[in-house]
Structure formats: structure tokens, C-alpha cells
Amino acid sequence: MAKILVADDAPAVLDVLDDVLTMEGHEVIRATTGGEAVRKFQESRPQLAVLDIIMPDMDGLLVLDAIRRVDSDLPVILITGLVGESLGKKVERYQGVAFFEKGSGLDRFVDLVNKTLGMPGKPGP
């Protein structure tokens, strides 16, 4: 399975994402700030980064910029509780980035992770 960097400043969200990804067999590297996410990316070289857009000290888009300077091909999923036209305009310049709206369901999140990693999804009911 994959090594996945998950960055979110909300401990409850980070715990849930860590739990679900670990249950899927992935190794999770956790970060609670943007700066920590960049540092842990450099140390661990994950196969996927899951980044909250709004974090203290450095938002997910700045983290994405820092990651892209080192690895322009790393798959990235941006997660947010905010949706709207202004957010869409901010992120439309990023190629190869998936988006996940918090609260959309963990099954949907796992499917997006698998799709982004190029792994088969779970069969439906």
C-alpha cells in the first residue's frame, strides 16, 4: 500500500482520516500545520499528499506550491469544508489535483484516494 501525508489542523479530522487510511493498509504521516507538512514531505517522500486548504502558518495551496517545486508529479488531494466560486478560481490553476469536500463521506474519500493512487476501488453493494 501507499505512504500518505495527511495535513489538517483539526485533530478530529486528522484522526478520522488517519484511521480510515490505516484500515485500508496505508502508512499515514500526519501534520497539523503547513510548515510541518512541507517538512514531513521532504523527510518521508510520500506517494500521495492529502492537504487541508485552510491551516495555520501556511495554507494547503502554499504547501502544494512547495511540494510541486520538489515533485511536480506527486498526486495531491485538497480537502476543505469551504466550497464556492472563489475557491474554485484559486485552485483551477493546479493540474492533477483532486478535491474532497469534508463531510462528503468516508467511502467517497477512500474511493478518491484509491483512484488518485491508481488503485482499484472497492466493489459496490
Language-model features: locations:
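Conserved sequence signature across two-component system core domains
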Residues: A7-D8, A31, A49
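Two-component/phosphorelay signaling modules centered on CheY-like receiver
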Residues: P11-I29
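Acidic catalytic/metal-coordinating carboxylates
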Residues: T33-E36, D59-L62
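Conserved phosphotransfer cores of two-component systems
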Residues: Q42-S44, A66-L74, Y94
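Active-site beta3 strand of CheY-like receiver
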Residues: S44-V50
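Receiver (REC) domain active-site loop signature in two-component systems and cognate sites
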Residues: M55
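Alpha4 helix (beta4-alpha4-beta5 surface) of REC/receiver domains from two-component response regulators
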Residues: L62, V83-D111
